[in-house]
Structure formats: structure tokens, C-alpha cells
């Protein structure tokens, strides 16, 4: 399965770094930064001294994964999503409270029926999630259910849970 991660409007450099390290651990094919997501050099559009500071902060949690992953920066996310869909990718929105499909309900048969072998996982900002103007590009919303008091997992933790499930955990549900 080919997996692309889009980090859209994620504020925290530490969340970005954690996602990059997790992405490297699961052999993600590509990272796309968009919106105000802090991106490491060479994708940063900031002044050089600020870009270096951001890159160093990301490196603290990425531990070099920012250098091992294929990555780019999208100046126009809607064009990027349109291009990816036209190229055969299906878009998954990792979101809560929009339950299309809860993660544990996705068995191997359901995944094969709903998704192609090329997927994009769209991650939104930490507080408000994915912007509603992007919903029309999303083929499937996946929710990771919570049983505690909080409404959602941290974006980097939710990403790790979903990537594990897509890479390895889905086989646990085979009958």
C-alpha cells in the first residue's frame, strides 16, 4: 500500500517532528506540508534564521527523519488534492466526530472494498481538525474512538495509531 501524508495547518513543530519520525518508522512514501504547517529546510518559506530555528525544533522529535522522507510543500492544497485524486489516490481524513468509519470497524474486506492501494491521509490542525472546505475531497473519514474524558488524541498519536493499523493491524481482523 502506497501512503502519502498531508500535514495541513499543524501548528506545533514537535507534532510535525513526531509525525515525521513515525512516518519513517512505517515507511511512508511521501510527506506533503501545506498551510501554516512548519516545514523543515528546504521547504520552509521563512527567513533563513527562522527556518533554521524551525528545522532545529522539528529535528528534536524527528531525530533525522526529516532528512530520510520524500517531502514537498503544497502552495495550493485543493490543487494538490485534485491532482492526487486524478492520479488514483483515495483521500482519508483522520478526524473525530464525523464518524464515517471507526478505525476498529475497518476489516481487511472493508478496506479492500473502500480504498485503492494508493492512499493519502489528510491531517488537520490540532484544535479544529480538518477545515470543512476540504471535506469534498475526502473519500473516507476515519475516527479513532475515545473512551476517556478528552475529545481526541494528539495529532501525532492519532497518526501513529492509524499508520500501525494500515500497515500491520488490519491483518489482525482477518477471518
Question: Which sequence ranges carry the predicted segments?
Answer:
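Short, acidic/turn-prone active-site loops that include or flank metal/cofactor-
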Residues: 36-37, 126, 146-150
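Short glycine-rich anion-binding loops that position phosphate/pyrophosphate groups of nucleotides
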Residues: 96-99, 125-128
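Short amphipathic alpha-helix with an adjacent loop that forms part of the alpha/beta core around
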Residues: 80-86, 104-115
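Short amphipathic alpha-helical segments
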Residues: 18-19, 45, 104-106, 133-136, ...
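Structured adenosyl-cofactor binding patch, chiefly the S-adenosyl-L-methionine
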Residues: 24, 132-175
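RNA substrate-binding interface of SAM-dependent RNA methyltransferases
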Residues: 1-96
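Residues that form or flank phosphate/diphosphate-binding pockets in enzymes
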Residues: 14-15, 101, 129, 153
Amino acid at each position: 500500500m502506497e501512503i502519502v501524508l498531508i500535514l495541513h495547518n499543524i501548528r506545533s513543530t514537535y507534532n510535525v517532528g513526531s509525525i515525521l519520525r513515525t512516518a519513517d518508522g512505517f515507511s511512508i512514501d511521501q510527506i506533503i506540508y501545506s498551510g501554516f504547517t512548519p516545514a523543515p529546510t528546504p521547504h520552509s518559506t521563512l527567513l533563513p534564521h527562522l527556518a533554521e530555528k524551525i528545522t532545529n525544533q522539528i529535528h528534536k522529535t524527528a531525530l533525522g527523519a526529516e532528512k530520510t522522507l520524500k517531502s514537498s510543500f503544497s502552495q495550493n492544497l485543493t490543487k494538490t488534492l485534485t491532482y492526487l485524486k486524478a492520479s488514483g489516490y483515495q483521500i482519508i481524513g483522520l478526524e473525530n466526530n464525523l464518524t464515517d468509519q471507526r478505525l476498529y470497524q475497518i476489516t481487511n474486506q472493508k478496506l479492500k472494498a473502500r480504498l485503492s492501494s494508493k492512499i493519502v491521509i489528510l491531517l488537520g490542525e490540532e484544535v479544529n481538525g480538518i477545515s470543512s472546505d476540504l471535506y469534498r475531497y475526502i473519500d473516507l473519514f476515519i475516527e479513532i474512538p475515545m473512551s476517556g474524558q478528552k475529545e481526541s488524541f494528539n495529532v501525532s498519536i492519532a497518526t501513529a495509531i492509524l499508520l500501525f493499523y494500515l500497515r500491520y493491524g488490519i491483518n489482525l481482523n482477518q477471518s
